[in-house]
């Protein structure tokens, strides 16, 4: 995009705009096909009204990642594992969460190698081991982008773990006991070390982790194992760092939350009304923090 539009900010906004449109269509399809007919538009509404939705419009990676990840999921649903692998590879090239997506796709390949949108459970013939192996081998193509990135980092820095070390140095992210992580995050959210705006952001982080854990539990109870794996890995990675950081942004990538909310609102209208009444003012606050140069997650 920068080749066509020389201004970096405008290029980033255009990429987010196009990718966001693709992601919105794909999310609507997943909600309609995998969750409940008639919930597609509502799921998209809840995504774009979420607390961290500002980052979908800004020149960040969330919209582009979702465009690749959601279309990869739709391809896997049809049993097109090559397309799913290529799209998941694109997601992996953009964010490390693409590896979590790949793990979820691997679980889906083991359970329904022919795809789960081609027939009902009763109509679908039993999967053969060869089908599962073929699907899993095909998905390995998604590892090519992160593998090349690791090779690039090794050649550039001489360190295979350069990315992890940069995360630790720049963002204080390293594997930490989740109990210690929770305590540190709680202190940051409700202590007196930071200013009120920073406290507010950390309070959102705590709520976001709670929402993520609840989503994992609900998905596991409903035996949606691929989505459970993806959500659990995403939340687990952020809940075992030094403190909770950028979790509301990570929730943007968890389509089961938005699809699940849409289903809940279809059953009980007050659920959606309450969500929007709380989320929209928070989203506006986050946008204002970002545009005034404050930390916004």
Task: For each feature predicted by the language model, list its residue ranges.
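Short acidic/glycine- and proline-prone juxtamembrane loop motifs at membrane-interface regions
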Residues: 58-64, 247
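Signature aromatic-anchored transmembrane alpha helix within multi-pass, membrane-resident enzymes
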Residues: 139-143, 267-296
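Transmembrane-helix motifs of polytopic, lipid-linked glycan transferases
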Residues: 14-34, 214-216
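Membrane-interface alpha helices of multi-pass inner-membrane proteins
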Residues: 69-74, 82-108, 141-145, 235-238
């Amino acid at each position: 995009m920068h080749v066509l539009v020389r201004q970096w900010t405008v290029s980033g906004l255009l990429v987010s705009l196009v990718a966001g449109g693709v992601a919105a269509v794909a999310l609507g399809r997943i909600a309609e096909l995998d969750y409940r007919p008639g919930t597609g538009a509502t799921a998209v509404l809840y995504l774009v009204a979420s607390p961290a939705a500002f980052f979908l419009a800004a020149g960040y990676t969330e919209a582009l990642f979702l465009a690749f990840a959601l279309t990869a999921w739709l391809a896997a649903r049809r049993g097109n594992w090559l397309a799913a692998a290529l799209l998941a590879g694109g997601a992996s090239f953009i964010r490390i969460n693409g590896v979590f997506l790949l793990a979820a796709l691997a679980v889906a390949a083991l359970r329904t190698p022919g795809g789960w949108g081609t027939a009902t459970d009763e109509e679908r013939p039993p999967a053969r081991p060869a089908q599962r192996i073929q699907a899993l081998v095909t998905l390995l193509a998604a590892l090519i982008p992160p593998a090349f990135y690791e090779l690039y980092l090794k050649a550039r820095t001489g360190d295979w773990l350069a990315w992890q070390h940069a995360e630790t140095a720049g963002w204080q992210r390293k594997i930490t006991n989740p109990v210690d992580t929770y305590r540190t995050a709680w202190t940051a959210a409700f202590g007196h070390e930071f200013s009120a705006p920073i406290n507010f952001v950390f309070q959102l982080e705590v709520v976001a982790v709670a929402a993520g854990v609840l989503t994992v539990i609900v998905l596991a109870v409903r035996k949606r194992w691929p989505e459970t794996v993806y959500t659990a890995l995403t939340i687990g990675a952020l809940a075992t760092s030094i403190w909770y950081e950028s979790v509301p942004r990570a929730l943007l990538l968890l389509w089961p939350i938005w699809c699940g909310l849409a289903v809940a609102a279809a059953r009980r209208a007050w659920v959606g009304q309450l969500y929007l009444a709380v989320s929209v003012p928070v989203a506006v606050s986050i946008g204002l923090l970002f545009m005034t140069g404050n930390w916004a997650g």
